[in-house]
Curated annotation (Swiss-Prot):
Transmembrane segments: 363-383
A family per Pfam: PP2C
Residues of the PPM-type phosphatase domain: 59-348
Listed name of the protein: Protein phosphatase 2C 57
Keywords, in A-Z order: Chloroplast, Hydrolase, Magnesium, Manganese, Membrane, Metal-binding, Plastid, Protein phosphatase, Transmembrane, Transmembrane helix
Known EC number: 3.1.3.16
Similarity-based family: Belongs to the PP2C family.
GO biological process: dephosphorylation; photosynthetic electron transport chain; photosystem stoichiometry adjustment
Amino acid sequence: MALLRPHLHRFHSNTLRHSAYPSADAGGGLVVYPTYGRHRCSAIAIDAPSSLTGVTPIRWGYTSVQGFRDEMEDDIVIRSDAVDSFSYAAVFDGHAGSSSVKFLREELYKECVGALQAGSLLNGGDFAAIKEALIKAFESVDRNLLKWLEANGDEEDESGSTATVMIIRNDVSFIAHIGDSCAVLSRSGQIEELTDYHRPYGSSRAAIQEVKRVKEAGGWIVNGRICGDIAVSRAFGDIRFKTKKNDMLKKGVDEGRWSEKFVSRIEFKGDMVVATPDIFQVPLTSDVEFIILASDGLWDYMKSSDVVSYVRDQLRKHGNVQLACESLAQVALDRRSQDNISIIIADLGRTEWKNLPAQRQNVVVELVQAATTIGLVTVGIWMSSHLS
């Protein structure tokens, strides 16, 4: 098979503090990793050749911004594999250090590829088999990470990381997700949230299930944090909530966070933080425009509907997915995002943005909103006239 190199277009970023570099892997595909640190440099938009996806070229935009944090703990990976004919993209949001993220950037991809039998499992369309393979891959990587942290990490290394992974093959995408990053999709301008937040607080069904699971494992929730400590309930690493739970309890007593009497009543029946992912299959029908993966440094400061609308507006203006990605990160910074921000946008290349009528995607929504408003006003007038 002739290996095609993606076309690289460079655009200079004058505001965002980030760094990224591409490199070719042994299979002739493309690998993208951001570098750590607070830098100003060029960013790269990748037009993956159609042979990688079997449909139309995917145009990738990405940025990873340190923002106002003292350290950069996020990471992103994009791999377009010409041999195995699928694309892989991942956003990692680290915490308590970056060592877990650095381990995951290579190991998770390799484990996923192995579990998917170098992509051949994707050909069969057996979602149950694909789901099982990806779950095993995540859990295997977590076990290896915990061993690595114990063998090579500092004794005080309590780092961990969320992960939101997207695999695209032909006209279908698979999302594997743990943590509080998020993936959303634009379908003719209508937003679809593809993932749930794995957080031990909130009133959503996912949050309630996470709280229940943590408590059944013997944990407890204080102010939306497991054991008063961590605000995500699924993540890689976080060794103190897995293989070193008893050490965590002892440390808490030594630091005066809880008493020995309290600890004596604790009986762990499982891990409070787990790396078992949610797996979703997403058909990429002709009306799917783009998919966004991003860390919570974006979503905590912008509604997903606003994010999709903003990206569409940007693409209508100039059609450049990389500039749209960088501009989106800047908006989050302008809204005082205090976290690292990492964003990947996969424009599926199906939309002629310059020919797309402005606000076309909002017509139905606006009509519904207008009808609702008129209805509420009418009811209000009726009630006022009859109650007065």
